[in-house]
Amino acid sequence: MGTFKIRCKVENIVDREKSAIIPQMLVDTGSEYTWVSEHVLTKLNVSREKKDVSFVMANGQIVTRHIGFALLRYDKYFTVDEVVFAEKGDLLLLGARTLEGLSLMVDPRKKKLVASGPIPAA
């Protein structure tokens, strides 16, 4: 499929004045979660709600990270989702759950995000 990056805005879910632009976030449908720099999330006062959650990295390494809640925006789309506090050396990722919440999907030929269509209700 190839890879591509997007520009994404992250906001504190309670105080939306606290926000940051992530200029280069890798779209990764293989990652369940979205990973945002712990420095950015701390600056936005995003609380660490789940602590020491285990993740298996692409290279097989097991790491533990904290998880919080943030509002994520891309273009006219937005959703509230769990975000991983990415540490130094971790990739900044837009994961599959966030894509689903945004009602977006990957167009592999054009390497961009497109609307996924109507949301199934049943």
Regions found by a protein language model. Name each.
Residues 1-122:
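Pepsin/retropepsin-fold aspartyl endopeptidases
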